[in-house]
Amino acid sequence: MSNESKCPFHQTAGGGTTNRDWWPDQLNLRILHQHGTKSDPMDPDFDYAKAFKSLDFQALKQDLTALMTDSQDWWPADFGHYGPLFIRMAWHSAGTYRIGDGRGGAGSGQQRFAPLNSWPDNVSLDKARRLLWPIKQKYGNKISWADLIVLTGNVALESMGFKTFGFSGGRADVWEPDEDVYWGSEKVWLGGDTRYGKDQVKAQAPGQGDLVAEPAKHGEEQNRDLSAERNLENPLAAVQMGLIYVNPEGPEGNPDPVASGKDIRETFGRMAMNDEETVALIAGGHAFGKTHGAGPADNVGAEPEAAGLELQGLGWANKFGTGKGGDTITSGLEVTWTSTPTQWSNEYLNNLFNFEWELTKSPAGAHQWQPKEGKGAGTVPDAHDPSKRHAPSMLTSDLALRFDPIYEPIARRFKDNPDQLADAFARAWYKLIHRDMGPLARYLGPEMPNEELLWQDPLPKADQPLPSEQDIAALKTKVLASGLSVGELVSTAWAAASTFRGSDKRGGANGARLRLAPQKDWPANQGTGKVLAALEQIQGEFNNGGKHISLADLIVLAGTAAVEKAAKDAGYAGNVQFRPGRVDASQEQTDVESFAVLEPLADGFRNFTKARYSVKAEKLLLDKAQLLTLTAPELTVLIGGLRVLGANHGGSKHGVFTDQPGTLSNDFFRNLLDMGVEWKATSGDNESFEGRDRKTGQVKWTGTRVDLVFGSHAQLRALSEVYGSSDGKDKFVKDFVAAWVKVMELDRFDLK
């Protein structure tokens, strides 16, 4: 008998067929409970912002600068300088950000975890982070991995002669992989079939998709018709599973620079970069370093998540030659762009336009480009052998900057005006590494730029005295006497606050942008104009009396007053917390195009959908709840409360399971859980339902999928039972008020 067969355990905890295996379409409420105290090793009172402020920032930068040229035998530096490797590390950490849902990005150090730590596009970045470990170990919790990864990229640029725009810290680490990010539904690495498939799902609920590894294929075009229109699935911002942006060989391995330009524009645009920023990032980033494709890809071993224990979290062990240095295999491409790969220059663009290019292949068989007629030979140094020289080389995605009709004039202008490139690259790089940080109130450190940038959603300074408690009480009275209903006041405050996204910290009530384009014109906000007009009148009268309240504060205060009234009408006294200090942004401080991505295509909290989607309404609700950083109990209690308060879009009666709308009762849960009611679909697509009395057959209620899921889904029903019980009334009111205040203050980083 083998030793293995003697083991009394055939499987350990967590193994076996899971609920997700049995019911893959089941709502995944786990995405609402990520990054909690059970996975966080830090003390409950640990304050990262406070720790960061105690950091000797300049000493850290000096240590990072010294590391750049401290080549290690176990992973030698190209050209004796780690700068290009660290730029790629920072770029690939920040570059996962996509503007569609704000997810991805550098904000929490996710590059340390699966799947990002094992993406094909991140080969060798495991080595970059290991090179950083002695410095991280030295400074400990005063610098997060998330901040250190980005700062190291900044210092790398500076160490090679480039003047950066600045750096801000404030990215706190998490300690487990994100489960909410939808990276695509392909089942193999570098697959792209479903994100461009004809029958693709146009919008995805978060956290779906399983992955298996597949060997990289270089120089092989996939068998799909590239002449067909390429519609990249939303919210994805990469052309293939496991890539940051585009395939550098061209779309799916097709070495067509013009087609590559289209992919670049799509993917960089989804990361909130315009054409000029895109050209600047590529031209600036490729001023440094090289790519690696010394030999065939089948020499490379498993990625970190699949590698053996003895490799200690490193992956892609390379059996080609020494497996490092001049024998390194990363992308399979073997390209060095300039003769000064560790010094800032404009040579990348000079080479791009001054040479004519012909297609060739790397030693790994990947499509790349070399100067025609052998020109440029001997001008580029070898990364590890001083006796060798090379010609410059380019990627298909590089040639896109020359042959794309929009990129070409921008790139040519940068070639002829190096100062313009330097400024554009500095600003675009700063935007790249800070795009998911949210408002300036979150920025930390001595190198924060003084200039406010439009993409940061700037707010005016709060320089007015705050209203007193007596003022607030008087304003509540005026609001409640204005003739506006509880439902109107609540839904307007919700419309303002619920644009917040915990992913990139954008949106929220602060700024009162609900009154500005584009938010004032969103279908989801129909009916808020009437409320805003009334509130602006109250604001004007109050401010004309020598005092001040912002409209942003008044919107939230009005909703809060309505919640207090509804609770009082249900028999519960007490005040709902309101903390003033919000300000009103101007239209000039509001980038209409940038804010357009915050538009709710569906908001189950208001029973609103803009159109019919292939993703079920309850999954869109879950996505919204996760972006609002809600827990499952908070999601549940908010739905029940908002329904009985009459906050539905357009005054819809769906889900208003009460005879006393406007009163903060637990009627939604009591009536949903009533076994005297039988539910049946009233639409062919099972989107709307009616509940009939089992005895009389009379219609009692109507509802949507978002309403009925709280009685159908086992976990949500369990939560609904808590609030629908006879002793759950007090808890319902208390929990609703707490969740309401949380949402109203999600963007109040000035209070945190």
Swiss-Prot record:
Q: Which catalytic reaction applies to this protein?
A: H2O2 + AH2 = A + 2 H2O; 2 H2O2 = O2 + 2 H2O
| Modification after translation, per record | Formation of the three residue Trp-Tyr-Met cross-link is important for the catalase, but not the peroxidase activity of the enzyme.
Catalytic machinery residues = H92
Matching CDD domains: catalase_peroxidase_1, catalase_peroxidase_2
Q: Where is this region: Disordered?
A: 1-21, 204-228, 366-391
Q: Which cofactor does it need?
A: heme b
Q: What is the cofactor note?
A: Binds 1 heme b (iron(II)-protoporphyrin IX) group per dimer.
Q: Where is this cross-link: Tryptophyl-tyrosyl-methioninium (Tyr-Met) (with W-91)?
A: Y245-M271
Q: Where is this cross-link: Tryptophyl-tyrosyl-methioninium (Trp-Tyr) (with M-271)?
A: W91-Y245
Q: Which domain of life is it from?
A: Bacteria
Q: How does it assemble?
A: Homodimer or homotetramer.
Q: What does this protein do?
A: Bifunctional enzyme with both catalase and broad-spectrum peroxidase activity.
What is this protein called in UniProt?
Answer: Catalase-peroxidase
Q: Which species is the source of this protein?
A: Pseudomonas putida (strain W619)
Source lineage: Bacteria, Pseudomonadati, Pseudomonadota, Gammaproteobacteria, Pseudomonadales
